[in-house]
Each structure stands twice: as C-alpha cells, then as structure tokens.
Amino acid sequence: DICDDAVAQCSMTLCQLCYNTEICELSVIGSCQPPFS
C-alpha cells in the first residue's frame, strides 16, 4: 500500500501522504530527508 511504498522508496510525497501513520512513525522517519527525518 502507499505506506509500504513510502517505507520502500522513502519518497517525500508518499511520506506526506502517510505521515502520522504508525508505519511512517516507525519505519520512515529517520530514513527520509527533512521534514520527515
């Protein structure tokens, strides 16, 4: 799903779309560029 894609691709657009979801909190933040790091 879109959150899996965000984790896999570390896409800022996808991070925005699934920001504040648990998978982004745990798996994307810290891997993506600001403001999602």
Swiss-Prot record:
GO molecular function: pheromone activity
Pfam families membership: E_raikovi_mat
Disulfide-bond pairs as recorded: C3-C18, C10-C32, C15-C24
Listed name of the protein: Mating pheromone Er-20
Keyword set, alphabetical order: Disulfide bond, Pheromone, Secreted
Entry's localization field: Secreted
Purpose of the protein: Mating ciliate pheromones (or gamones) are diffusible extracellular communication signals that distinguish different intraspecific classes of cells commonly referred to as 'mating types'. They prepare the latter for conjugation by changing their cell surface properties.
Coiled coil: none
Subunit and interaction comment: Homodimer.
Gene Ontology cellular component list: extracellular region
InterPro entries reported in the protein's UniProt record: Pheromone_protoz, Pheromone_protoz_sf
Organism of provenance: Euplotes raikovi
